[in-house]
Regions:
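NAD(P)-dependent short-chain dehydrogenase/reductase
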Residues: 148-195, 201-202, 208
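Rossmann-fold cofactor-recognition segment
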Residues: 38-53
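N-terminal Rossmann NAD(P)H-binding glycine-rich loop of SDR-like oxidoreductase domains
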Residues: 1-26
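Catalytic helix-loop patch of NAD(P)-dependent Rossmann-fold dehydrogenases
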Residues: 88, 93-96, 103, 107, ...
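NAD(P)H-binding glycine-rich loop region in Rossmannoid oxidoreductase-like domains
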Residues: 49-89
Length: 301
């Protein structure tokens, strides 16, 4: 089996390569069909997915069985001021990959986000794959358009929405909190935005299960359990053994202090219903997955 990974140097792309090399992760061994898979890692310096012809030619040359698109413009605030760049990477890039995968009959696994949803409370019920997207930020809007292009142009597609992703690699909320906790006595974190922290180990494992599945469609794939960013930050400080005090603030208070920040959904908790009904939901509780992160973290920031 031949798997091509775009955005290979990001936190998810790196974790996918690690698991494919080790043939296992903390959750368990990889499926037999994935062992000895040929992995083609690629990043923007080798392939610009916003270039349609270059993308089609690259996919034709390598003939992958599966393409996992981890490439994205993920700076939520930055997307507001660099809308053209966000549109190219988050919408045009997936479109080009979908066109290319269709030409060689490859599966396309496209990674998306909880930010395609508006953040309405939904009666406190986590959003499953039937929920209607209505993004409130440029990031969410461009990611939703990318989803729509993938659905339209590649029949053998998986759209995997995740949330609050962190790992030992790259930049993420967990490592940011640790850095702040090491240099500050007190920080403030919003307490009225709720979602699902997701360890990249868990996400990568389930993406690889989908890579050998024929149950195409939209999937939610997040850590189990719901918390606020404030709750998450408190758990991080505890896990890192830091004494930094975390104080809660509202989104309105944060926005007043940071007027250039993008709107973010107040409620973006996802339910992994499709995962549970097909390949199985082995995503760990977010607190257990965070403890595992600290148990295996080498201290690098």
């Amino acid at each position: 089996m031949k798997i091509l990974i775009t955005g290979c140097r990001g936190q998810l792309g790196t974790e996918l390569q690690r698991q494919l090399s080790a043939e296992s992760c903390a959750i368990g061994p990889l499926p037999e069909r994935l062992r000895k898979a040929t992995v083609i890692p690629v990043d923007v310096d080798e392939l610009d997915i916003t270039d349609r012809e270059a993308t089609i030619n690259y996919i034709r040359r390598h003939q992958p069985d599966t393409v996992i698109n981890c490439a994205a413009f993920t700076n939520v605030d930055g997307c507001e001021t660099a809308r053209d760049a966000a549109f190219k990477v988050n919408a045009i890039g997936p479109r080009n990959l979908a066109l290319a995968c269709e030409k060689v009959n490859a599966r396309l696994i496209h990674i998306s986000t909880d930010y395609v949803f508006p953040g309405t409370a939904n009666g406190g019920v986590a959003l499953d794959e039937c929920a209607v997207p209505a993004p409130i930020s440029a990031y969410g809007q461009t990611k939703l358009l990318g989803e729509q292009y993938v659905e339209r142009f590649c029949r053998r597609h998986f759209i995997v929405r995740t949330a609050w992703l962190y790992s030992a690699y790259g930049k993420n909320f967990v490592k940011t909190m640790i850095r702040l906790g090491q240099t500050h006595d007190k920080i403030t974190v919003v307490n009225d935005q709720l979602g699902n922290p997701t360890n990249a180990v868990d996400l990568a494992y389930h993406i690889l299960k989908l890579a050998i599945s024929h149950d195409y469609g939209i999937y939610h794939c997040t850590g189990n359990g719901i918390c606020s960013w404030y709750d998450f930050a408190c758990a991080i400080m505890q896990g890192a053994g830091l004494s930094c005090k975390v104080e809660p603030v509202t989104s309105a208070e944060y926005a007043a202090a940071n007027p250039a920040s993008a709107s973010r959904p107040a409620w973006s908790a996802l339910e992994n219903r499709m995962l549970r009904c097909t390949v199985g939901d082995e995503m760990r509780d977010w607190q257990d997955a965070l403890k595992d992160f600290f148990a295996n973290w080498n201290g690098e920031l």
